[in-house]
From Swiss-Prot:
InterPro entries: AceGlu_kinase-like_sf, AcgluKinase_fam, ArgB, Asp/Glu/Uridylate_kinase, Glu/AcGlu_kinase, NAGK-C. The lineage of its organism: Bacteria, Bacillati, Cyanobacteriota, Cyanophyceae, Synechococcales. GO terms for molecular function: acetylglutamate kinase activity; ATP binding. The gene is argB. It is an enzyme of class 2 (transferase). Its EC number is 2.7.2.8. This is Acetylglutamate kinase. It catalyses: N-acetyl-L-glutamate + ATP = N-acetyl-L-glutamyl 5-phosphate + ADP. The keyword Ribonucleoprotein does not apply.
Length: 297
């Protein structure tokens, strides 16, 4: 019996210690906006999904203002298969004709978005689902010189609807679909949407959940994770080829958001349980943080 009591006491003491260490971060970030791009394995694994949702609700509960931007590639492929459309990609981009765009919008806006809203609400948060069309939050333009159909870039952002929601205590959950000036829906990369929205909101942080540890000096060796770097160092890593392949657009997205006023951008492994809390509320974090000059935390 005594050993059980000792165990319970030790566990409780550990929890108190963790909360105590997190307190300075909670105090510093209270009232500030954090944009989280949610995707990858953390979206497919139900156990990881539960932990991400709980992390987001925890952040809101301690006064941080989380905004969630999501994609949903695997579920799009599932539904394309159901209707007999074979997914096609070109240079890493989903070829999106009119029929595919209908499925993309149905899945991202009607299914994935509402599932995330429901999960956040069930966990004790207050979520509201949006896409780029709502309140003209984002206006798209067709990618030039790519020949991939209705795949877009962010032309402009009007973040007032999101600002209204976060100031009222809601957690906006935004799918990466937006219309162009003629009303045509476009599929936009969720990282890009998150970065541009973070800039428009003047966010404290942009966090990209990915399927890699972060920025590695040697992509084959997780122990070479770079925990903190500035904009110039990030650009140099791209120029030297250390940042390569699919990591280039993610780092570029982070750098662009920082150049527009976001204070810090993080790339972290969403496959790690409670990755968000570990990154935001611990000294070292678990991913890579790119910062604007003069950033202390």
């Amino acid at each position: 019996m005594s050993s059980t009591q000792d165990y319970i006491g030790e566990e409780a003491a550990t929890r108190v210690k963790i909360l105590s260490e997190a307190l300075p971060y909670i105090q510093h970030f209270a009232g500030r906006t954090v944009v989280v791009k949610y995707g990858g394995a953390a979206m497919k694994d139900s156990n990881l999904k539960d932990k991400v949702i709980r992390d987001i609700v925890f952040m809101a509960s301690v006064g941080i203002r989380p905004v969630v931007v999501h994609g949903g590639g695997p579920e799009i492929n599932t539904w394309l298969d159901k209707v007999g459309i074979e997914p096609q990609f070109k240079d890493g981009l989903r070829v999106t004709d009119a029929a595919t765009m209908d499925i993309v919008e149905m899945v991202l806006v009607g299914r994935v978005n509402k599932e995330l809203v429901n999960l956040i609400n069930q966990a004790g948060g207050k979520a509201v689902g949006l896409c780029g069309k709502d309140g003209q939050l984002m206006t798209a333009r067709t990618m030039t010189n790519k020949d991939v159909g209705f795949v877009g870039e962010v032309s402009s952002v009007d973040a007032r609807v999101v600002e209204t929601l976060v100031k009222s205590g809601y957690i906006p959950v935004i799918s990466s679909v937006a219309a162009d000036e003629f009303g045509q829906a476009h599929n936009i990369n969720a990282d890009t949407c998150a970065g541009e929205l973070a800039a428009a909101l003047g966010a404290e942080k942009l966090i990209l959940l990915t399927d890699t540890r972060g920025i590695l000096r040697d992509y084959k060796d997780p122990s070479t994770l770079i925990h903190k770097l500035d904009i110039q160092q990030a650009r140099e890593l791209i120029g030297s080829g250390i940042v390569a392949g699919g990591m280039i657009p993610k780092v570029t997205c982070c750098v662009r958001s920082l150049a527009q006023g976001v204070r810090a951008a993080h790339i972290l492994d969403g496959r790690l349980p409670h990755a968000l809390l570990l990154e935001v509320f611990t000294d070292l974090g678990i991913g890579s943080m790119i910062v604007a000059s003069g950033y202390d935390l």
